[in-house]
């Protein structure tokens, strides 16, 4: 299976993708480097597909990957609940392609190519 190493060992890479996936589910739009955005795209697509399936096993698989962070302060909803109750129903008729990666130019400090990844 081909994937980007992102300059990290496997545990750090998995932790990074978990954090970014959780942030994208909560905020629905984040800015990161192009390589991270492209790698994150496949992870988030799989999570949304699990959300669309909606059964207990899918919920547990998503919970094993996504961090338990509060998505909405007022309702107390966490990221997993948001994925299954808000985001997944939105894409019920769509077969994949839930995210969009937009290139935004180089980062000021080190010139790294930046991108915005958002839910369509």
UniProtKB/Swiss-Prot annotation:
One term under GO cellular component: cytosolic large ribosomal subunit
GO biological process, one term: translation
Swiss-Prot/TrEMBL keywords: Ribonucleoprotein, Ribosomal protein
Pfam families according to UniProt: Ribosomal_L17 (PF01196)
Molecular function GO labels: structural constituent of ribosome
Gene3D superfamilies in the record: Ribosomal protein L17
InterPro entries according to UniProt: Ribosomal_bL17 (IPR000456), Ribosomal_bL17_CS (IPR047859), Ribosomal_bL17_sf (IPR036373)
Assigned protein family: Belongs to the bacterial ribosomal protein bL17 family.
Quaternary structure annotation from Swiss-Prot or TrEMBL: Part of the 50S ribosomal subunit. Contacts protein L32.
Record-linked HAMAP family: Ribosomal_bL17
Protein name: Large ribosomal subunit protein bL17
Organism: Halalkalibacterium halodurans (strain ATCC BAA-125 / DSM 18197 / FERM 7344 / JCM 9153 / C-125)
